[in-house]
Swiss-Prot record:
Disulfide bonds: none annotated. This is Ribulose bisphosphate carboxylase large chain. GO terms for biological process: reductive pentose-phosphate cycle. RuBisCO catalyzes two reactions: the carboxylation of D-ribulose 1,5-bisphosphate, the primary event in carbon dioxide fixation, as well as the oxidative fragmentation of the pentose substrate in the photorespiration process. Both reactions occur simultaneously and in competition at the same active site. The basic functional RuBisCO is composed of a large chain homodimer in a 'head-to-tail' conformation. In form I RuBisCO this homodimer is arranged in a barrel-like tetramer with the small subunits forming a tetrameric 'cap' on each end of the 'barrel'. Heterohexadecamer of 8 large chains and 8 small chains. The gene is rbcL. The modification N6-carboxylysine is found at residue 201.
Length: 475
């Protein structure tokens, strides 16, 4: 009874009230320091858009399902998330809409993608009042961007380290992805690098299995790198996958790579986790190692149009966490990827300043300030006939990665690498002459086959191979 009197005197009124009374504020003026989020929301039948949107703002910031007396011990008006705009669509049977929410910067720990995601995409995705919810985009304010170190090195520093300019980089994932011994694996790496590739790569699930322990792989791959460099006079690299069961083991493997003198390591950032990724990125920056990032598991999170997190958000947060390369899809290969959507998040990975452009799925203008860019990696079901389209789509600041498109060459790995290098150089040549590479690229490849038997064989093998399916995730 005593406590009840004190509570009443303090003006606390227990009970449940609509979220929209507190968290829906259409008159709110967005601040430059706010983190902005665009959610695609599908509410349960009978739930008004304002209430559903306000529930998202509440549950991802200061709110809970009922009024609590400790609300009076802080300033909710300062710390709460606010839904400031709702965008509806005519003719939507499920009442789906886009809600825009502003979060005060004080809600988030500096330099922590882990904390950012825990708040914004935490409990709210299991909220019963919503049938589905998808985070379409985030606006990261410069004030928050500057609390992150970002990519270990960035695009320009990588080019300077490699001494390679004026064209995309060429890579290859070693296949079969599992089952090779370390020595045979090293041989496959050597053949690809000496044939003209800039990089070869561990597949995402190559860690340290009984058939090939990580240290053995690192040693044989380092030997392959040094041998191919001495023969070609070019800087070569292999993405040594440092992903492991613990963060300590990840850093241990990266340290071994540094001691061997190789230029780059790799991490599976979603399965490995953002905390480990940020720690590895810091180590790579201090050690001079480049960091290649694989997005294994991303489609579990981003492929469904109505629920999950769009890849453009994952790409933004990876840039904050740190990585010099990130797989981005190919548009033309075997993996999901709409062209306009892909170009949108490729710009978000590489550019310093990206304007709002809904035609490419970009909901907010993003200013990265001085943070370095991330090289997009096009990988998955691509071969020499795709080269003109890849050069047209991605330009120079990209890594084009041909796994089966190198190792599947009828004459072996090295000729497969030669074919890809010749195809790339042929497309770059006509582009630099002012020709339309998308329209004239096929003719350039046919012309190059007259003096490159390796390219001729590759063109013959893959002339009928296409991956033509409708894209699920469109604007």
């Amino acid at each position: 009874m005593i406590f009840a009197k004190k509570t009443e005197a303090a003006g606390f009124k227990a009970g449940v009230k609509d979220y929209r009374l507190t968290y829906y504020t259409p008159d709110y003026k967005v601040k430059d320091t706010d983190i902005l989020a665009a959610f695609r929301v599908t509410p349960q039948p009978g739930v008004p858009p304002e209430e559903a949107a306000a529930a998202v703002a509440a549950e991802s910031s200061t709110g809970t399902w009922t009024t609590v007396w400790t609300d009076g011990l802080t300033s909710l008006d300062r710390y709460k998330g606010r839904c400031y705009f709702i965008e509806t669509f005519e003719g939507q049977k499920d009442n789906q809409f886009i809600c825009y929410i502003a979060y005060p910067l004080d809600l988030f720990e500096e330099g922590s993608v882990t904390n950012l995601f825990t708040s914004i995409v935490g409990n709210v995705f299991g909220f019963k009042a919503l049938r589905a919810i998808r985070l379409e985009d985030l606006r990261i304010p410069v004030a928050y961007v500057k609390t992150f170190e970002g990519p270990p090195h960035g695009i320009q520093v990588e080019r300077d380290k490699l001494n390679k300019y004026g064209r995309a980089l060429l890579g290859c994932t070693i296949k079969p992805k599992l089952g090779l011994s370390a020595k045979n694996y090293g041989r496959a790496v050597y053949e690809g690098l000496r044939g003209g590739l800039d990089f070869t790569k561990d597949d995402e699930n190559v860690n340290s299995q009984p058939f090939m322990r990580w240290r053995d792989r690192f040693l044989f791959v380092a030997e392959a790198i040094y041998k191919s460099q001495s023969e070609t006079g070019e800087v070569k690299g292999h993405y040594l996958n440092a992903t492991a069961g613990t963060s300590e083991e990840v850093l241990k493997r990266a340290e071994c790579a540094k001691e061997l003198g190789v230029p780059i390591v790799m991490h599976d950032f979603l399965t490995g986790g953002f905390t480990t990724n940020t720690s590895l990125s810091k180590y790579c920056r201090e050690s001079g190692l480049l960091l290649h990032i694989h997005r294994a598991m991303h489609a579990v999170v981003d492929r469904q149009k109505n629920h999950g997190i769009h890849f453009r958000v994952l790409a933004k947060t990876l840039r904050l966490s740190g990585g010099d390369h990130l797989h981005s899809g190919t548009v033309v290969g075997k993996l999901e990827g709409d062209k306009d959507v892909t170009l949108g998040f490729v710009d978000l990975m590489r550019d310093d300043y990206v304007e709002l452009d809904r035609s490419r799925g970009i909901y907010f203008t993003q200013d990265w300030a001085s943070m370095g860019g991330v090289i997009p990696v096009a990988s998955g079901g691509i071969h020499v006939w795709h080269m003109p389209a890849l050069v047209d789509i991605f330009g120079d600041d990209a890594c084009l990665q041909f796994g089966g498109g190198t190792l599947g060459h009828p004459w072996g790995n090295a000729p497969g690498a030669v074919a890809n290098r010749v195809a790339l150089e042929a497309c770059i040549k006509i582009r630099n002459q002012g020709q339309n590479v998308l329209r004239e690229g096929g003719n350039a490849l046919r012309e190059a086959t007259k003096w490159s038997p390796e390219l001729a064989a590759a063109c013959e093998v893959w002339k009928e191979i296409k991956f033509e399916f409708d894209t699920i995730d469109t604007i």
